[in-house]
């Protein structure tokens, strides 16, 4: 069992806290004028995405989480599982739809994404920051809508995602979308 002592807690390190893998988002070493020093830490639980703040004594230690991140290509889904392949080893990995969650609207076949494993079990996926998707339906607009330059309309994309787009986007357009915010970025020509 490998451990990190509290004075080695750094941003980006992954540890086990309360039997759950956590990511250290920030840590601050505090040495008060009187008393024992301590470390104030913000942890993000990787299974529930919950953010917690915790204070550890300088003598505390936590186990290092067995977290591995792979860059895999999305192949297909059968409704319950989503299948990915490692392009280096050609090993396939199936991920339950519950783990895919809201990211399924950003996945296209052959796109790469990061799959995070804990004890060789998938716990999360992270799609590319930007994806290019085809518009298959747009909301009807009124003739006077073009007066306001900040006007937008809803567009349905090939994966089923719905995003706000400028009025000039039409059915068949290829657009770039930021998967972190779900917002339109630009039109692809």
From Swiss-Prot:
The keyword tRNA-binding does not apply. May be beta-lysylated on the epsilon-amino group of Lys-34 by the combined action of EpmA and EpmB, and then hydroxylated on the C5 position of the same residue by EpmC (if this protein is present). Lysylation is critical for the stimulatory effect of EF-P on peptide-bond formation. The lysylation moiety may extend toward the peptidyltransferase center and stabilize the terminal 3-CCA end of the tRNA. Hydroxylation of the C5 position on Lys-34 may allow additional potential stabilizing hydrogen-bond interactions with the P-tRNA. It is found in: Cytoplasm. The keyword Isomerase does not apply. GO terms for cellular component: cytoplasm. It holds the Pfam family Elong-fact-P_C. Pathway: Protein biosynthesis; polypeptide chain elongation. InterPro entries: Elong-fact-P_C, NA-bd_OB-fold, Rib_uL2_dom2, Transl_elong_fac_P/YeiP, Transl_elong_KOW-like, Transl_elong_P/YeiP_cen, Transl_elong_P/YeiP_CS, Transl_elongation_fac_P. The modification N6-(3,6-diaminohexanoyl)-5-hydroxylysine is found at residue 34. It comes from the Bacteria. One of its GO terms (molecular function) is translation elongation factor activity. This is Elongation factor P. Involved in peptide bond synthesis. Alleviates ribosome stalling that occurs when 3 or more consecutive Pro residues or the sequence PPG is present in a protein, possibly by augmenting the peptidyl transferase activity of the ribosome. Modification of Lys-34 is required for alleviation. Belongs to the elongation factor P family.
């Amino acid at each position: 069992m490998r451990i990190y002592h509290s004075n080695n807690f750094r941003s980006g390190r992954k540890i086990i806290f309360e039997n759950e893998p956590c990511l250290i988002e920030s840590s601050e070493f505090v040495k008060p004028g009187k008393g024992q020093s301590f470390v104030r830490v913000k942890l993000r639980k990787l299974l529930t995405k919950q953010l917690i703040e915790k204070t550890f004594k300088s003598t505390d230690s936590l186990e290092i989480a067995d977290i591995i991140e792979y860059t895999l290509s999305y192949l297909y889904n059968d409704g319950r599982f989503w299948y990915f392949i490692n392009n280096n080893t050609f090993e396939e990995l199936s991920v339950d739809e519950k783990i895919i969650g809201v990211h399924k609207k950003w996945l296209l076949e052959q796109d790469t994404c990061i799959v995070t494993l804990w004890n060789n079990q998938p716990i999360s996926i992270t799609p590319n920051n930007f994806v290019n998707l085809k518009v298959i339906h747009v909301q009807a607009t009124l003739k006077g809508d073009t007066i306001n330059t900040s006007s937008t309309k809803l567009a349905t994309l090939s994966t089923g995602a719905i995003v706000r787009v400028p009025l000039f986007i039409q059915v068949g357009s290829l657009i770039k979308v930021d998967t972190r915010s779900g917002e339109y970025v630009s039109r692809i020509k």
